[in-house]
Amino acid sequence: MPKLRSATSTEGRNMAGARALWRATGVKDNDFGKPIIAIANSFTQFVPGHVHLKDMGSLVASAIEEAGGIAKEFNTIAVDDGIAMGHGGMLYSLPSRELIADSVEYMVNAHCADALVCISNCDKITPGMLMAALRLNIPVVFVSGGPMEAGKTKLSDKLIKLDLVDAMVAGADSNVSDEDSAKIERSACPTCGSCSGMFTANSMNCLTEALGLSLPGNGSMLATHADRRELFLEAGRRVMALAKRYYHQDDESALPRNIANFKAFENAMTLDIAMGGSSNTVLHLLAAAQEADVDFTMADIDRMSRLVPHLCKVAPSTPKYHMEDVHRAGGVMGILGELDRTGLLHTDVFHVAADNDGTPGSGTLKSVLAQYDVMQTQDEKVKHFFMAGPAGIPTTKAFSQDCRWPSLDNDRQEGCIRSREFAFSQEGGLAVLSGNVAENGCIVKTAGVDESNLTFVGSARVYESQDDAVAGILGGEVVAGDVVVIRYEGPKGGPGMQEMLYPTSYLKSRGLGKACALITDGRFSGGTSGLSIGHVSPEAAAGGTIALIENGDRIEIDIPKRSIKLAVSDVELNARREKMHSLGPMAWKPIGRQRYVSLALKAYAMLATSADKGAVRDRSKLED
């Protein structure tokens, strides 16, 4: 039987000092010997997705203590990618993922916690905590802050739905009046919560459900809805149940590495492709798989992208549906249910929402779907749960409303979630492309690509940084038929692998959204749509071919064939490569870029791998 990790600091006379300190935190005589559950919160007033999390740790703690545990909360950092976007602040976003993972590891291991609840929400916080949880491999439950309500406003007497990207595009579009732009800005983000579309934050919170590490509704239940309160309480109860299974019953199925195994990663990626999730999820799943020692790679993602249909289309890929609509249609469990009916899901994997009593099928995703898939459940409480809807009242308060949709969206032919027969497309919403531009692959969110752009041939317009690209787009340098190439923005080259939401938004605002392509060794916001190809690997700073592209080069993109090709002969490419090598210390570096890179970012760049490895640390540089 495994011994409580916390016994290291609570048992024996030699730990009298440690016990004295535990007592000073509120631990009583009869508490010693109970499991100590760490609560990793990420409350901050900087981020709308986290501004309401201040009291969530206490809520989880109350359930833990009622179930017989000791709850101890700590906080970690959270960067708002939207606020950090478009300036030097974005250099810090992806590196913050590693800091979050490390900070959770440091706190949990320094204090010998027995189990963990992760209260996350936005872009790098859920992935960072996920990496830490799989690194630590102690019982864990994830519970996020939830998505914000979609914005709504009237323009030209027509009610429209809005999100953050609409505000950015309107602000850059000279054809939109100052009055309408201000109206959109004030309406785009009406409540607390992660941005309302299938952007990175919501994509990752959905994926934790598919990985088996969070409860049904985690990815889709609105932050403002009163029903979300129960998710926090249940997270506390579930983590205690998992801790008891592991420490009292020697049940290793309660550990995250036995839940999030290879099959679970396939389930998560299958969901991601089916719902057209953010391309950033590829980066984060690859990173999490490395922490879990799961051999899940770009090759697996490429294979799956050819098999999985696109069953759920959500903003930014369409203005019609947002996360509140996904929830009404059954949330993640609704999508997984449809995938199960197509034979594309592993349902024999363990899940934190299910009790494992040793009987066949218990504790698995199959039993969770039986209860929570709205198309098969007989549980009226579950149906009531998925009818939770928006109130349309601006607020920063969690659990502030209890509005319901009049009915569930069970329309699998024309609704938000479709059956395979009526899929938005028979190939999913993400694809891996490869070719001489990206020998190790690159990612495109096909859910956001217009059908007319699935194949594209154009002339390269090369920029050495996002800043130069923005200036070029706004200055009229980019014209229809161009392939905008933004390089030296990868994990090493940026450093930090900036998101390119501003360049794509500005292309849209100038009417070039369907007339141009954009490729980069950087990445894209979950809010990006259009022919935007990111994660080019190897990156320019690591000797990738993207560094050798010249203005006017012909670039051929063929998404159905999964190819991206620089139409330059091997002889010419080799000559360019030799010329680059001849530059010595200046080789594989941006020409003329003016950018301050702090010591912290330089340290990150020294160990960062390219995107095809998840942009994690290069372990070969750390291990003997």
Curated annotation (Swiss-Prot):
Pfam families: ILV_EDD_C (PF24877), ILVD_EDD_N (PF00920). One of its GO terms (cellular component) is cytosol. Pathway: Amino-acid biosynthesis; L-isoleucine biosynthesis; L-isoleucine from 2-oxobutanoate: step 3/4; Amino-acid biosynthesis; L-valine biosynthesis; L-valine from pyruvate: step 3/4. It catalyses: (2R)-2,3-dihydroxy-3-methylbutanoate = 3-methyl-2-oxobutanoate + H2O; (2R,3R)-2,3-dihydroxy-3-methylpentanoate = (S)-3-methyl-2-oxopentanoate + H2O. [2Fe-2S] cluster binds at residues 122, 195. Keywords: 2Fe-2S, Amino-acid biosynthesis, Branched-chain amino acid biosynthesis, Iron, Iron-sulfur, Lyase, Magnesium, Metal-binding. GO terms for molecular function: 2 iron, 2 sulfur cluster binding; dihydroxy-acid dehydratase activity; magnesium ion binding. It is an enzyme of class 4 (lyase). Binds 1 [2Fe-2S] cluster per subunit. This cluster acts as a Lewis acid cofactor. GO terms for biological process: isoleucine biosynthetic process; L-valine biosynthetic process. The keyword Cytoplasm does not apply. Mg(2+) binds at residues 81, 123-124, 499. PROSITE patterns: ILVD_EDD_1, ILVD_EDD_2. InterPro entries: Dihydro-acid_dehy_C, DihydroxyA_deHydtase, DiOHA_6PGluconate_deHydtase_CS, ILV_EDD_C, ILV_EDD_N, IlvD/EDD_N. The modification N6-carboxylysine is found at residue 124. Its EC number is 4.2.1.9. The active site is at 525 (proton acceptor). Its cofactor is [2Fe-2S] cluster; Mg(2+). Homodimer. Belongs to the IlvD/Edd family. Functions in the biosynthesis of branched-chain amino acids. Catalyzes the dehydration of (2R,3R)-2,3-dihydroxy-3-methylpentanoate (2,3-dihydroxy-3-methylvalerate) into 2-oxo-3-methylpentanoate (2-oxo-3-methylvalerate) and of (2R)-2,3-dihydroxy-3-methylbutanoate (2,3-dihydroxyisovalerate) into 2-oxo-3-methylbutanoate (2-oxoisovalerate), the penultimate precursor to L-isoleucine and L-valine, respectively. This is Dihydroxy-acid dehydratase. The lineage of its organism: Bacteria, Pseudomonadati, Pseudomonadota, Gammaproteobacteria, Alteromonadales.
